[in-house]
Regions:
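Conserved non-cysteine loop/helix-boundary elements of the Radical SAM core domain that shape
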Residues: 1-51, 57-76
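Terminal RNA-binding accessory module
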Residues: 67-172
Length: 172
C-alpha cells in the first residue's frame, strides 16, 4: 500500500543521511479518475521524492491496457504529467537547497564551461551536480576521477551548486 511505501521511505531517511529517493510515475492509465490523480499527487508530495521520472500512459495495440475502459485523452494525460513534473522540479530544488552551507563530497567527472567560466563538475553521493571553479587547481592538475570536499555555496544553475573555493580539499 502507499502507507507501507511511505513508511519504507521514512525508515530510509531515519537510517541514512539525506538519501536521494526517486521514483517513476505513469499518469493517465486507463480508468484513472481526477480523485485517483489527486491522491497520487498528494502521496508523491508527502514522500517528497528527490526526482520523479514522470511519463504519460502510452496506449499499445494488443495489450490488455489497450482494451481497458476509461481511456483518457492526450490533453488530460499531458496536463497531469505536467503537474507532476513541476512538483518533481520543486522537490528536487528543495532537496538540493538542503546541502547549501554544508560540507559535501564530490566525485569530479569532467571540465565544462558554465556562463563563460570554467569548472570541474561532478556528483555527490546523492547525485547532486556540484561545480568547482577550475582555477582552484594548479595548471596541469587534473582532478578528474578524484574526490574533493568543501562547503556547498550557492546555485550556479538551477541544477548545479558551486563549492566555496576557500573550503575545497582533496579527499585521500
Amino acid at each position: 500500500t502507499t502507507l507501507e511505501f511511505k513508511h519504507s521511505c521514512d525508515l530510509i531517511r531515519e537510517y541514512f543521511h539525506h538519501p536521494a529517493i526517486t521514483t517513476d510515475v505513469i499518469t493517465g492509465f486507463p480508468g484513472e479518475t481526477a480523485e485517483d490523480f489527486a491522491e497520487s499527487r498528494t502521496f508523491t508530495d508527502d514522500v517528497s521524492f528527490y526526482e520523479m521520472h514522470v511519463f504519460k500512459f502510452s496506449r499499445r495495440e494488443g495489450t490488455k491496457a489497450d482494451k481497458m475502459p476509461g481511456q483518457l485523452t492526450e490533453s488530460v494525460k499531458a496536463e497531469r504529467s505536467h503537474v507532476l513534473i513541476e512538483q518533481s522540479e520543486r522537490n528536487s530544488r528543495a532537496f538540493r537547497e538542503e546541502i547549501i552551507g554544508k560540507e559535501t563530497e564530490v566525485l569530479v567527472e569532467y571540465k565544462e564551461d558554465i556562463d563563460g567560466r570554467s569548472y570541474w563538475t561532478g556528483l555527490t553521493r546523492e547525485y547532486i551536480r556540484i561545480a568547482i571553479p577550475a582555477d582552484v587547481f594548479s595548471e596541469g592538475e587534473n582532478p578528474q576521477d578524484q574526490i574533493y570536499k568543501g562547503i556547498s555555496g550557492s546555485f550556479l544553475t538551477d541544477e548545479c551548486i558551486v563549492l566555496d573555493r576557500s573550503s575545497i580539499i582533496k579527499v585521500q
